[in-house]
Amino acid sequence: MKNLKNLFLAVFALSLTALTSCLHIIEEATFRNNGSGSYKMTLDMSEMKGMMDMFKGMEDGNVLGTEGDSTSIQGEGDYTPPADPATEDPMGGLGDEMSNVAASIKGVQGISNVIEIKDTSNFNFGYSFDFTDVAALNRALKIINKDKYDTKVEEIFRFNGKSFERLAVGDLGAEMQKAMMENGGEGEEGGMDMAKMFLADMSYKQIYHFPDRTVKKSDNKISEITDDGHTLTINLKPFSEEQQKSKAGVAAKVKLK
């Protein structure tokens, strides 16, 4: 879980910097009647952008207003100091952890149209791909979980046309909680409380589309079904005390018709 832990600690650090926890992880999948479909994982930090831009503007203003800067070069025209890595890449490599998946799953049987999502302007990162059947989807996710998050996951989804199941594995929300707990040792309760406070509104949303079927029933207590019955949504908040008490999770058994 080393890579995953580093990823989530980077998220927390950015949350502290931006004074906001507007982080949304979105897992979206479409399952057609023949078992084929598409999968997309997105890390959406777009709501942080305004705050980060404001801080950058304040820093730029301070630089312009500084007099007698010892680093200035007189008589040599305009001088641009070397770019600060944090300014050059404010995400600290966070986007690479989410989006550099294409090389890992290209060539996997049953997987096609692999696309990296790396929108540094709007703080959106992730990946998407098409699959021929649920077995191909599970193969790809097994590779992604092993290579990128150092977790062993054999099977995440089951689908046979009449039923759908999302197993209680590969849960990024639960893994985030574990990563934060492992980072906090004895005597660091205050740090954990701060983490929970800043990440209380973080969401991990699963959206499942069934264009050829309608959802009859779901055993996940917080799942919601659209009026047309073709989409099921589970909106988790891993650091919400209310959801923690109710033991909310990603697992869902769904009956289709």
Predicted regions span which residues?
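Bacterial N-terminal signal peptides that target proteins for export
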Residues: 1-9
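Residues in flexible loops and secondary-structure boundaries
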Residues: 9, 33, 37-39, 53, ...
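Hydrophobic helical h-region of N-terminal Sec-dependent signal peptides
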Residues: 9-16
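C-terminal motif of bacterial Sec signal peptides marking the signal peptidase cleavage site
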Residues: 18-21
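Start-of-domain marker
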Residues: 23-110
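Mature, soluble, non-transmembrane domains
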Residues: 95-257
